[in-house]
Amino acid sequence: MLLDLNRFSFPVFLKEVRLLTTLALPMLLAQVAQVGIGFVDTVMAGGAGKEDLAAVALGSSAFATVYITFMGIMAALNPMIAQLYGAGKTDEVGETGRQGIWFGLFLGVFGMVLMWAAITPFRNWLTLSDYVEGTMAQYMLFTSLAMPAAMVHRALHAYTSSLNRPRLIMLVSFAAFVLNVPLNYIFVYGKFGMPALGGAGCGLATMAVFWFSALALWIYIAKENFFRPFGLTAKFGKPDWAVFKQIWKIGAPIGLSYFLEASAFSFIVFLIAPFGEDYVAAQQVGISLSGILYMIPQSVGSAGTVRIGFSLGRREFSRARYISGVSLVLGWMLAVITVLSLVLFRSPLVSMYNNDPAVLSIAATVLLFAGLFQPADFTQCIASYALRGYKVTKVPMFIHAAAFWGCGLLPGYLLAYRFNMGIYGFWTALIASLTIAAIALVWCLELCSREMVRSHKAV
């Protein structure tokens, strides 16, 4: 049977579901809070006007592409730390965490410079109003300053989640979400003596909450008794290029996979810009809601990575394979709920963002397409995270490259412009690309986990 789902009794299945849920739920709440920051940005910008909403859509797409790609690179720390923890190598856990912070800081500075360099080419390429382009440039400038803190936060995020302590991440994320609301209100609308920055104010608020999140999570770890034996904050460690090389070897394919998937969504915003601001605004609504729902498989997948990595560290290879299957089943059950939510409540969901009739009509149709790809999206996400627990990252990268670019973005462009399907051509191609990725990744997971069990039985 697929991933030996019939290997253990039903009580064992329920136990694994419970363990995955215990890990995934705080991660989900933390992810929802983080995506909620983007949701607040979208709502606040929409309140300032559809020009500001379009500017934030463009600017946040650029920021999200860099952030998500680099977040994928930092995700290498999860299987590294989880396997060390499972093997009982306490000192190595703390040292790997320290090197992760150094790596994240260097990566974040590079991301900041990269975003600065991208502002002028984006403005030269776009053909929108001066106000939209200027607001987008300001937004990108502010959010670029968040990149160093964002990557340090991701290192600390990986450290705490891999040690089965996701509750700290949840608490910090909710505090950041709460802080983001008044900051957006102040900066966007010009309250308490501050100038009204419009959509650019969303970027300034985002920068502030990322720095808050990194600092708060560091303080939590330093003061929590559970973390003291690992010694993350007990001493200062110099950068170790050998560890950096290991992080890069595992993380670079993950980062590229994230980029390929994110670009299939983010680049669409730029490609549909010639259709007008209504379509750009509607696309931002679809991306925002899809991003919120994507946190569900991402959280289940993250929990699966930790549980699989921990089991492999303990040399429980059959258990790791079984956990891979259980995480997929849990994801499929949750996917049914998200499909129904998007289809049945698409109109009220869209109205939370903007009341412009044209935007409402386009966005409501976009959500139908988003609902159709939920099962495939859940499957490919959780399967890729499970493979990550095995430190298998290159094959998923190639699968994502073929699926999202070969079967997604490029065909979507042809459907949109050559076959006159407009924005819906891109979403049609995305459904096909996600389905192909899901099938290929599950097949890869089946082979990889089976071979791991067989090879260690033979020893």
UniProtKB/Swiss-Prot annotation:
InterPro entries: MATE_fam (IPR002528), MATE_MdtK (IPR050222), MdtK-like (IPR048279). It is a multi-pass membrane protein. Its main location: membrane. It is found in: Cell inner membrane. The chain crosses the membrane at residues 20-40, 53-73, 100-120, 132-152, 168-188, 202-222, 254-274, 286-306, 325-345, 358-378, 395-415, 423-443. GO terms for biological process: monoatomic ion transport. Keywords: Antiport, Cell inner membrane, Cell membrane, Ion transport, Membrane, Transmembrane, Transmembrane helix, Transport. GO terms for cellular component: plasma membrane. One of its GO terms (molecular function) is xenobiotic transmembrane transporter activity. Multidrug efflux pump. Belongs to the multi antimicrobial extrusion (MATE) (TC 2.A.66.1) family. PANTHER family: FMN_FAD EXPORTER YEEO-RELATED, MULTIDRUG RESISTANCE PROTEIN NORM-RELATED. This is Probable multidrug resistance protein NorM. It comes from Neisseria meningitidis serogroup B (strain ATCC BAA-335 / MC58). The lineage of its organism: Bacteria, Pseudomonadati, Pseudomonadota, Betaproteobacteria, Neisseriales. The gene is norM.
